[in-house]
């Protein structure tokens, strides 16, 4: 009975376990030093003290039985120095200065990177149509801080402004431009269209028919003014320009006849506007000729009147009665003749 009790007791089991276990110890150098711990009594005392005293207990330097010699705050924590404990405030100050310096350096680096990024974005972006010289090109725009709604509104307003600019018609001014090769004038609308072909190298322009005749004989277009050869030429209008690159030239004398037959069938106007313009020009020339004829007749009449008056003055030395009667009759006859001339000029 006693053997059964001894076999079932937990003490015998623990002893048998200790007999079969091998304990190994590491050297003292490899064993880490345990961190200092508060005793249970000190933990209870710390729990009974108020929150401020508990915070201060964790930042006590020196023996608490000695009087307090220094108190200071570092990183929102209060430190208390007791007695002549080895302590130097410069350590805390240097640590604080180093942290502030590192934080300032990091902030400076972030600002430099942000400025470089914004400067690259401004260089690659195309200028807006509503650019104003008041805004400096070095101005930093914080586009990254805009919300998607603000970006959409700015894009919408920009597109709306462009549509309004396109809707306003520009004043059309007809200009007569001279070709240096064929000596022909071409009437085009200024800043809207052009009948000339311009080289991409020297910007000298020729009419399209001269460009065609030149390209039939040469593979490259050679400017007639500066003798510079260029493979491509440009034709401009109000939307932009089209580059012309000749691919082949086919010699066919019947092709131009076929082309003109198509023009006469499809591109001729049925209105009589050219004839009306010719009639108006002829009427204006006729009115000018009539005005010149009337002025010439009036000059001739005035000259004849002056000659007759001079003759009458020479004859008026004979007798007073006879001279007076003769001058009256002659003056009346001359005045009547002058009025007839003026009436005839008015009728014309």
UniProtKB/Swiss-Prot annotation:
Taxon lineage: Viruses, Viruses incertae sedis, Naldaviricetes, Lefavirales, Baculoviridae
Homology family: Belongs to the alphabaculovirus IE2 protein family.
GO cellular-component term (any): host cell nucleus
Coiled coil regions in record: 272-306
ZnF endpoints (RING-type): 179-227
Alphabetic keyword roster: Coiled coil, Early protein, Host nucleus, Host-virus interaction, Metal-binding, Modulation of host ubiquitin pathway by viral E3 ligase, Modulation of host ubiquitin pathway by virus, Transferase, Ubl conjugation, Ubl conjugation pathway, Zinc, Zinc-finger
Source domain of life: Viruses
Biased composition, class Low complexity, residue ranges: 316-333
Keyword Transferase carried by entry: yes
Protein name: E3 ubiquitin-protein ligase IE2
Known role: RING-finger E3 ubiquitin ligase that plays an important regulatory role during the initial stages of infection. Migrates to specific nuclear foci early in infection supposely to prepare the sites for viral replication by targeting and ubiquitinating host proteins.
